[in-house]
Amino acid sequence: MSFVVIIPARFSSTRLPGKPLLDINGKPMIVHVLERARESGAERIIVATDHEDVARAVEAAGGEVCITRADHQSGTERLAEVVEKCGFSDDTVIVNVQGDEPMIPAVIIRQVAENLAQRQVGMATLAAPIHSAEEAFNPNAVKVVLDAEGYALYFSRATIPWDRDRFAKSLETVGDTCLRHLGIYGYRAGFIRRYVSWQPSPLEQIEMLEQLRVLWYGEKIHVAVAKAVPGTGVDTADDLERVRAEMR
């Protein structure tokens, strides 16, 4: 099947300035992400960035770049600018791969595209089972609850679903009911155009989760369990050192 990968790569980062260009074993991080995307079989891969230095690094690795504005409030807004500049038709399948995921398995990039293509829905994503209490109660690990057909009911930084009987006895174990949302999305290009026309929703502003805008406006998000779990993403200096060691 045919799909396009867009990799948002914002240069500024509060905790890690110039994050896309941070060296991981001899290559900028964004180049590692580009290589994972190439392994997925995508028809076209575009790095969306607001900085010329990132553009030069990607082009030196043979990649395609779209320079975007620096004032976007979310990765989806950056994608929308690329969709318009490239003139993608409304039915084009777009996969959003985060620019700070150098260890993302190529198989799940393709998986989210295939899941979207098989359904009459505007957006798809992935999740993975949570097995540790530390992760279940970590607000940085976003949880998702699904309906019987695999569509998202809600995303939250809180521990959902709350296992009342289990947690009343102990918070040391979590059972097998929690799913962690993985930050990879598939969309049809027309859906991205609709998304950015909607006003931000109260729920997304409370949780700081942009996917909640989709549910607020009554649209569906399909969620599949990932065929492989991504390695460490890079949000902090400690993450960077961990990834360097794991990829060595």
UniProtKB/Swiss-Prot annotation:
This is 3-deoxy-manno-octulosonate cytidylyltransferase. One of its GO terms (biological process) is CMP-keto-3-deoxy-D-manno-octulosonic acid biosynthetic process. Activates KDO (a required 8-carbon sugar) for incorporation into bacterial lipopolysaccharide in Gram-negative bacteria. GO terms for cellular component: cytosol. The gene is kdsB. The keyword NAD does not apply. Pfam families: CTP_transf_3. Keywords: Cytoplasm, Lipopolysaccharide biosynthesis, Nucleotidyltransferase, Transferase. It is an enzyme of class 2 (transferase). GO terms for molecular function: 3-deoxy-manno-octulosonate cytidylyltransferase activity. Its EC number is 2.7.7.38. Its main location: cytoplasm. Pathway: Nucleotide-sugar biosynthesis; CMP-3-deoxy-D-manno-octulosonate biosynthesis; CMP-3-deoxy-D-manno-octulosonate from 3-deoxy-D-manno-octulosonate and CTP: step 1/1; Bacterial outer membrane biogenesis; lipopolysaccharide biosynthesis. CDD domains: CMP-KDO-Synthetase. It is found in: Cytoplasm. It catalyses: 3-deoxy-alpha-D-manno-oct-2-ulosonate + CTP = CMP-3-deoxy-beta-D-manno-octulosonate + diphosphate. Belongs to the KdsB family.
